[in-house]
């Protein structure tokens, strides 16, 4: 008999959940629903009323990932994602800023990488000269070329959460949003210690969730950075520190990804599309399902799809 658990939460958390489960979203949405997602042994259905239902063998485990966050009081005023007290000042683009960004969260294969970079205001013209901009607009060769120069120009802190550890932490009830928050905070803390006694005029985090949710994720951490911290979506266009962090995070991710392909003995594809399902099925045949957590983010829907391909 399958379990069924219902939690009441805010629209902000439901949006965060939809983002976290984006690889597992179902085209079927029940009446009054916002989304339905299917992950291994659990179906998640979120409703406009704020209720979220978890059904299946892993209902309790999946619901527990969201229960502390779900205690956030519901906002009576609908706000835009960038409408909060942590919005950066309009002059931030010319300030000395510590910026952080992450890469690899939407890729089934490969780790999650987070990098924090400090850019002194005097270095902004140099970074522009080097071609620093959003890494999504650069190919891997351009990323490598710019990153190799950046490594000698800006102070940085780079963290890699490898797949085995990622899956272990996820199974302990840490959703992807929380893992990102922990890594951003750690990278920022590491870099502040590295550049001391220099203090940035501000810290800009490329926003992946509402700031209040970010700080809830960090509730049990001893060191949490709160002073002059700003959040903005598309942070790489707000300050070059985030753009530089994005480039170094991508550079690190690509290097780790190449190593993982060597370990797998086959070229692993990026992303989470159909070609990834096929590659995952081949990898399971090659190394066995027991070793899959060394290469992938197991909770992605691709895992179930790969096993379905093997049954055909």
Swiss-Prot record:
Alphabetized UniProt keyword annotations: Cytoplasm, Endonuclease, Hydrolase, Magnesium, Metal-binding, Nuclease
One family name in Pfam for this protein: RNase_HII
GO MF annotations, alphabetized: magnesium ion binding; RNA binding; RNA-DNA hybrid ribonuclease activity
Catalytic activities: Endonucleolytic cleavage to 5'-phosphomonoester
Gene3D superfamilies in UniProt: Ribonuclease H-like superfamily/Ribonuclease H, TATA-Binding Protein
Cofactor requirements of the protein: Mn(2+); Mg(2+)
A GO-annotated cellular component: cytoplasm
Main location group: cytoplasm
Compartments reported by the entry: Cytoplasm
Protein residues bound to a divalent metal cation: 101-102, 206
GO biological process terms on file: DNA replication, removal of RNA primer; mismatch repair
EC supergroup of this enzyme: hydrolase
Keyword Cytoplasm: yes
Domain RNase H type-2, residue spans: 95-312
EC number: 3.1.26.4
UniProt remark on cofactor binding: Manganese or magnesium. Binds 1 divalent metal ion per monomer in the absence of substrate. May bind a second metal ion after substrate binding.
Record's function text: Endonuclease that specifically degrades the RNA of RNA-DNA hybrids.
HAMAP family: RNase_HIII
Family indicated by similarity: Belongs to the RNase HII family. RnhC subfamily.
NCBIfam families (alphabetical): rnhC (TIGR00716)
Name of the protein this chain belongs to: Ribonuclease HIII
Source organism: Bacillus mycoides (strain KBAB4)
């Amino acid at each position: 008999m399958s379990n069924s658990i219902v939690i009441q939460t805010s629209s902000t958390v439901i949006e965060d959940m939809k983002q976290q489960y984006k690889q597992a979203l179902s085209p079927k949405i029940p009446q009054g629903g916002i989304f339905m997602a299917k992950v291994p042994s659990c179906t998640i259905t979120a409703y406009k009323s704020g209720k979220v239902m978890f059904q299946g063998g892993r209902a309790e485990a999946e619901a527990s990932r969201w229960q502390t966050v779900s205690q956030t009081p519901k906002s009576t005023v609908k706000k835009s994602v960038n409408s909060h007290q942590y919005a950066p000042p309009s002059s931030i683009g010319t300030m000395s800023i510590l910026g952080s960004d992450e890469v690899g969260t939407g890729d089934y294969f490969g780790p999650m990488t987070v990098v924090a970079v400090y850019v002194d205001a005097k270095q902004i013209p140099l970074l522009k000269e080097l071609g620093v901009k959003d890494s999504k607009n650069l190919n891997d060769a351009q990323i490598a070329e710019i990153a190799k120069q950046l490594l000698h120009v800006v102070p940085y802190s780079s963290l890699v959460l490898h797949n085995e550890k990622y899956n272990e932490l996820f199974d302990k009830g840490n959703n992807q949003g929380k893992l990102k928050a922990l890594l951003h905070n750690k990278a920022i803390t590491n870099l502040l210690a590295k550049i001391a006694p220099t203090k940035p005029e501000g810290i800009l985090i490329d926003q992946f969730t509402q700031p209040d949710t970010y700080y809830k994720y960090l509730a049990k951490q001893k060191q949490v950075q709160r002073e002059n911290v700003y959040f903005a979506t598309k942070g790489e266009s707000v300050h070059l520190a985030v753009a530089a962090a994005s480039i170094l995070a991508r550079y690190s991710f690509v290097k780790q990804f190449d190593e993982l392909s060597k370990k797998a003995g086959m070229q692993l594809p990026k992303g989470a599309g159909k070609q990834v399902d096929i590659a995952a099925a081949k990898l399971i045949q090659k190394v066995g399902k027991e070793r899959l957590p060394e290469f992938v983010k197991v909770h992605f829907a691709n895992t179930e799809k790969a096993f379905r391909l093997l049954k055909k």
